[in-house]
């Protein structure tokens, strides 16, 4: 595979995984849970 394709897939995977975690972390800090 092309290195650029692998890099894009990696960034997309990281974004999908860290997105909900960041929102969850911010919710905890704000005490909205």
Swiss-Prot record:
Keyword Transmembrane in record: yes
Record InterPro entries: PSII_Ycf12_core-subunit
Keyword Nucleotide-binding: no
Primary localization: plastid
Transmembrane regions: 5-25
Keywords for this protein: Chloroplast, Membrane, Photosynthesis, Photosystem II, Plastid, Thylakoid, Transmembrane, Transmembrane helix
Membrane protein topology class: Single-pass membrane protein
Localization per Swiss-Prot or TrEMBL: Plastid, Chloroplast thylakoid membrane
Role: A core subunit of photosystem II (PSII), probably helps stabilize the reaction center.
Family the entry assigns: Belongs to the Psb30/Ycf12 family.
Subunit architecture: PSII is composed of 1 copy each of membrane proteins PsbA, PsbB, PsbC, PsbD, PsbE, PsbF, PsbH, PsbI, PsbJ, PsbK, PsbL, PsbM, PsbT, PsbX, PsbY, PsbZ, Psb30/Ycf12, peripheral proteins of the oxygen-evolving complex and a large number of cofactors. It forms dimeric complexes.
Protein name: Photosystem II reaction center protein Psb30
Organism of this sequence: Welwitschia mirabilis (Tree tumbo)
Lineage, broadest ranks: Eukaryota, Viridiplantae, Streptophyta, Embryophyta, Tracheophyta
């Amino acid at each position: 595979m092309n290195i650029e394709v692998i890099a894009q897939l990696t960034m997309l995977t990281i974004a999908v995984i860290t997105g909900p975690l960041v929102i969850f972390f911010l919710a905890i800090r704000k005490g909205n849970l």
